[in-house]
Amino acid sequence: LLPLDDKTLLEHVICSMQQIFPQVIVSVREPRAGVELSQVRDEQAGSGPLAGLAAGLAKVATPWAFVVACDMPYISSQLVELIYKSRKNHQAVVPVVGGYPQPLAAFYSVSCLDVIRQALAGQDKSLRGVLQQLDVCYVDEAGMNDAALRSFVDLDTPEDYAAAVKNGLFEL
């Protein structure tokens, strides 16, 4: 669990989500000590984010769940609200930034669970493959303000992380 300012990346994301949602569930490969929230283990070990999504959707008490990666500490309530408003009768609402879908900062209906589990049982365990089988509303970045767009700064590489540490969480 990498630290950023006074918290780990996961703690930053959890804190942001707790300000928006009454229930926060952390999907993990293995249980994490020190996380005082409900944790669910991946339904199928080694199957990436799709396994975590399945476990989380199986646990939520609501018809929809917002899913966010733990390496996205800048996630904003503005982004969540914008995506939430686009749900309507879709199965998923996924933002598109720079021409690329962002399936790890998206809303998913629990009605997706069967399709996700079928994918986990098959060869293609990618979220993008699952999205092709769902009724998805894609939300283009054109309607997003700066705070919402900043949500998509993730810390995938050591260089991303080093820049965030150097600049402080709210300076990146």
Where are these regions (language model features)?
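Nucleotide and nucleotide-moiety/phosphate-recognizing core
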Residues: 1-127, 132-150, 162-171
